[in-house]
Amino acid sequence: DPILNINEIQKARNKEAVINDHIKKIVLEKKFFLSIGRFTKQKNYLFYLSCIPEILKIDNELYFIFIGKGEDKEKFLKISDKLNISDRIFIVDHTKNVHYFMKNANALVLPSLWEDPGFVLVEAGYNSCAVISSDCPNGPSEIIGEDGGYLFRSNSKSSLVQTIGLFLNDSKKSIIFKKVNLKKRLKRFTSFYHATNLKNKILN
């Protein structure tokens, strides 16, 4: 399981990431969904990309930021051009501070085909970032549950679009409720929890 250092996350949240002015403007002034991970089959970004035109029909003010590199990146960019949505897609190859993006994102979107169990999901939860995830094996369903975020059927376009619609139309109170539930569930991923657990095992 991933182990988080909460103090490091708090420090990073308050530091600006090194990004160009255009992306910085999106992060600070626009509504955007964030996705983090390599452009590979596992992360399933090509599937997610094919859903974005439908998502923009629900909310045409959205932008989409992806952090990562990988073998599918060039194909991803070509398809975004064909779909005529390249003005809404921004890719950051690498950053030392994902927490800055998570703090400002409307939601983290995790369209993966599988996870183990999803470190990005755990980090997002601790940054009070809403999570929209596939119900893929090894993590998301167990961590998010029914009240910690928004789950859609893995690799189902209709389910993803519908779930994002539910999120975009959800009340602020309901979104906060889910964020709080997720953060509570993530306590077992903190370094403090692991240190306390180890101490108890030694003493007992």
Where are the language model's segments positioned?
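Short beta-strand->alpha-helix junction loop in the catalytic core
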Residues: 1-13, 71, 96
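A short helix/loop element that forms part of the nucleotide-sugar donor recognition site in Leloir-type
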Residues: 9-26, 32
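A conserved mid-protein helix/loop that constitutes part of the nucleotide-sugar donor-binding site
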Residues: 31-54, 64, 71-77, 119, ...
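Aromatic "clamp/platform" in nucleotide-sugar-dependent glycosyltransferases that forms part
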Residues: 94, 113
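Short acidic/histidine- and often glycine-rich active-site loop of Leloir-type glycosyltransferases
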Residues: 123, 136-151
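Short hydrophobic beta-strand element within catalytic cores of glycosyltransferases
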Residues: 130-134
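Conserved acidic donor-binding segment of nucleotide-sugar-dependent glycosyltransferases
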Residues: 146, 150-157, 166-172
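A charged, aromatic-enriched C-terminal amphipathic alpha-helix characteristic of glycosyltransferases
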Residues: 175-203
